[in-house]
């Protein structure tokens, strides 16, 4: 047993308190994720204006729409997919975003679905671009290249919040014994950090490679979608399935099943981008 194995005994998920309001590391990490994604996108606009012909004010307005879509989609997606008492929230819709418990204590909003956030993001992007759909793929590409590094902070936040824990490390796994984290007296994979690396860093490198070697609008979001789906599918083998969900056919988790659907959506965007690529190039 090394110091890393027992790191959860060394810190509190609560960063600090403001009166009765407890500020968690996850909240701070999520705020960092938004800031990183925002400024990464601005840097891309300034560095490559031909690929991203968008004014800063225009992007700022779009970013608000996208972030709102992500938050709404992530929360509603969690309720519909993962929440055992989803029927209660569907009849008490206002409770979905209620950050207070029944005693009036601030507890924050727990339970967000990445894939739900993706759906919300796509819907928000379409609604914002519906008057000028020629820019839709440009917006999507911009988010595709700015989101992965922000995503890293989100998964680090999950790690600091001691949630979305990994599967139990087999006793014969030498590497697992080194990197594992003790959770409830069981050594588990640090799946949140594995996801941060695979779904954040590796996917970012994939999208940057695509940016260098492609010229068609819409391909960056396709590479992001396919790359994330693959990395998430792999990472799920180290992540403990949600207790209320378990596994399904072929022992696949819900995250893996949703990632397969994400592949289908990505291929659909690829068809749309291919069909409209000539028009987009002419309008540059």
Curated annotation (Swiss-Prot):
Compartment annotation: Cell inner membrane
A cellular component term, taken from the record's GO annotations: plasma membrane
Pathway, per record: Protein modification; lipoprotein biosynthesis (diacylglyceryl transfer)
Primary localisation category: membrane
Binding-site residues for a 1,2-diacyl-sn-glycero-3-phospho-(1'-sn-glycerol), renumbered to this chain: 155
Chain segments annotated as transmembrane: 21-41, 62-82, 106-126, 136-156, 190-210, 218-238, 252-272
Family in the record: Belongs to the Lgt family.
Protein name according to UniProt: Phosphatidylglycerol--prolipoprotein diacylglyceryl transferase
Source species of the chain: Helicobacter pylori (strain P12)
Taxonomic placement: Bacteria, Pseudomonadati, Campylobacterota, Epsilonproteobacteria, Campylobacterales
